[in-house]
Amino acid sequence: VEIAKEEIIFRRNKNVCFLLNTNGTLIDDDMMNFFVQEKFTVTVSIDGPQKVNDANRVFLNGRGSFRRIAENIEKLKKGGVDFNLRATISPKNTRLLETFLFFESMEVPYSYAFTIDSDVKDRSTTHFDANGIKTIDKQLGEVMNFFTRKFMGKENIYCNDFQRNINRLRTKSVRYQVCAAGRSSLIVDEAGEYYPCQNMLSYQDMSVGNVSEGIDNSRLQLFRSKEVSQLASCRQCWAKYLCGGSCEAERHLLGQESKDWKQKCKMIRLEWKHLIHSYIKLNDFINNMSNKHKIIDYEKFERAGA
């Protein structure tokens, strides 16, 4: 924080936003005061209700971390910290709708992502095979229908991804890159190493520099998010300007011609298929004469996608 203030805010007269990703197990009062003082936005990783979360997130003694995380989420709420939640959905999660019901009940903004395949992790915990994708297809339909019903009932929706993506369909916005990795954001780890995004943190060979020596621009160009129009594997895909080219970390880990990469692309298309179905239902609902008096606040989608 002090380095960023000195080098970027004071010397270069630029604004900086501080973001912190945490597993949510070590948050205390001093940290919360620091977050508020420095205007941090904190993302807490939690994968769902206790049974789901504790299947993956455990302490060294094997005890699940859910209760500790839940306690600290309440602390963040009471402390006035700007924070959100992030769920990682693994093949072990066979009750997707229950997971999203849990997050909506928390009444905290959240996002989700599917596990990233990696040869350094147990594939049973990260890889969705053909049967897993078939199951996810059905369950994603249930989840999107749930959000659609909430929206029609003018209930609050806390899932940032659903709101943002429906708004993108409504405004016909085009996604030229998948994310801001290495473009307008960098991640720094506890050793002072820079990475384009959090998904690369575990992989030293994806480092693009460090606090002491600065940024290696050639490596930054290699690992930052790419323009989807430059990606040969995306050129014939109908969802390329919705997806933006998918995760750059996975592209390097899997290889964009691999079977695993193609499976990942299939999952992304399934997700957008269900989002498009939800968008069509919402438009039909708005245009139905019997529902004309029910004004749906699209502005909240714009705020969520900002």
Please give the residue ranges for each predicted region:
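C-terminal accessory region of radical SAM enzymes
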Residues: 134-168, 198-244
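Active-site and channel-lining beta-strand-loop segments
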Residues: 184-199
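Canonical radical SAM enzyme core domain
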Residues: 1-42, 46-52, 60-68, 87-98, ...
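Radical SAM enzyme [4Fe-4S]-AdoMet core and its adjacent flexible, acidic
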Residues: 55-181, 185, 204
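Generic recognition of stable, solvent-exposed alpha-helical segments in well-folded globular domains
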Residues: 30, 68-71, 94, 98, ...
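Flexible loop/turn segments at secondary-structure boundaries
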Residues: 23-28, 51-52, 92-94, 119-121, ...
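Radical SAM enzyme core and accessory elements
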Residues: 154, 191-193, 229-306
